[in-house]
């Protein structure tokens, strides 16, 4: 059944708590999906910033183009072209991260009270954004295999939804990657029913294969796929640079997007352009991907060992570094979250990934940090709590 609810705003206070905890340095961070500083190419970033400042022009220190610096837009266009995705620099709008990009385009394409379709479980930040913008959320179920395209077509055809918000490559929290056939079909459905698909492709460069998967945008013929992303997950969460790509068919929205966009830090834009042109970013990705795969596999092995004797479901992501854990229904993820906080561990309870409590016995873990002794101890502590809970309910 399709689910239409509006109770996400009731969780806003809890979302604020989640964001507060993810910045505390004294916690074991298994919650927010972010790379370990050890995986960030700090020296390459420093060199790029120095070169960008050295070769900058006087006009680079004035208010810059709201669309983003031309050098960065050109660099991104050429970078994507190497992976088979062709987007012109003039169609790229630089934003201060992926969430601002999503917010911009949602406000341009839809109005307060419009319904947005989201496959769930879905990144809680997206759901929070939709709720804060007073858009209604219509959920269709996603699984480790991807999205039910028959259900997606049924909703598009019904005319109930104004747009869809989805991730095709290494979705958070499930980690699936849709096939090229499925992506092409989504683009065709969007055109057939004139329903915009806002594609969040933030994890595309975090796959376990060296070849980057193509986004839905690749098959877009009529401009109904709006492509968004950033380098927050592939480079550094502190590097607040993202984009939204508006095709020629959407030029009527251009003025609204530009007026709503905050000017992004110019030196950082130039530094990212330098990182791309110097090949340092490509080298970083080639190094990052196998390390992520190894790291995620280590987490999976340790989690299965720690929870031995407990019937759990554990995601098998093809990329990214989110892990989605399902426990027996007696286990309450929110209760586990509070237990973890009391013991200096940060996790994310499953119920914030959908509008009702169907994911209450799930949690999401971050595998972006190396599997340290401290993290192993934290996983052991969670496993011990789960086993005690199950023993008490059985007795």
Region spans (language model):
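Pyridoxal 5′-phosphate
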Residues: 30, 160, 304
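Conserved core of the PLP fold type I
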Residues: 56-193, 198, 204-222, 390-394
């Amino acid at each position: 059944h399709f689910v239409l609810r509006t109770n996400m705003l009731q969780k806003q206070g809890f979302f604020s708590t989640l964001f507060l905890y993810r910045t505390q340095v004294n916690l074991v961070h298994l919650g927010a999906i972010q790379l370990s500083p050890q995986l960030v190419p700090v020296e390459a970033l420093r060199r790029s910033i120095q070169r960008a400042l050295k070769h900058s022009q006087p006009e680079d220190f004035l208010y810059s183009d709201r669309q983003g610096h031309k050098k960065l837009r050109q660099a991104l266009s050429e970078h994507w072209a190497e992976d088979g995705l062709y987007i012109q620099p003039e169609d790229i709008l630089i934003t201060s991260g992926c969430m601002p990009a999503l917010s911009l385009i949602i406000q341009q394409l839809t109005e307060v009270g419009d319904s947005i379709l989201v496959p769930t479980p879905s990144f809680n930040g997206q759901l929070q954004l939709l709720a804060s913008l007073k858009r209604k959320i219509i959920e269709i179920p996603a699984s480790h295999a991807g999205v039910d395209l028959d259900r997606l077509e049924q909703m598009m055809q019904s005319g109930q939804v104004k747009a869809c918000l989805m991730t095709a490559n290494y979705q958070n929290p499930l980690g699936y990657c849709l096939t090229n056939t499925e992506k092409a079909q989504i683009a065709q459905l969007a055109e057939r029913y004139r329903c915009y698909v806002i594609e969040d492709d933030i994890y595309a460069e975090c796959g376990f294969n060296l070849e980057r998967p193509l986004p839905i945008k690749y098959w877009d013929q009529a401009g109904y796929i709006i492509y968004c992303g950033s380098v927050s997950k592939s480079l550094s969460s502190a590097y607040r640079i993202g984009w939204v790509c508006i095709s020629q068919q959407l030029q009527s929205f251009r003025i609204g997007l530009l007026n709503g966009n905050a000017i992004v830090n110019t030196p950082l834009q130039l530094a990212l352009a330098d990182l791309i042109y110097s090949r340092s970013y490509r080298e970083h990705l080639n190094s990052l991907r196998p390390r992520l795969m190894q790291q995620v596999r280590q987490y999976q092995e340790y989690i299965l060992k720690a929870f031995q004797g407990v019937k759990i479901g554990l995601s098998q992501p093809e990329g990214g570094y989110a892990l989605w854990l399902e426990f027996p229904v007696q286990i309450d993820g929110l209760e586990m979250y509070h237990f973890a906080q009391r013991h200096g561990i940060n996790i994310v309870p499953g119920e914030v990934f959908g509008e009702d409590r169907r994911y209450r016995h799930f949690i999401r873990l971050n595998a972006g940090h190396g599997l340290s002794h401290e993290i192993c101890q934290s996983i052991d502590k969670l496993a011990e709590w789960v086993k005690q809970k199950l023993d008490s309910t059985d007795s």
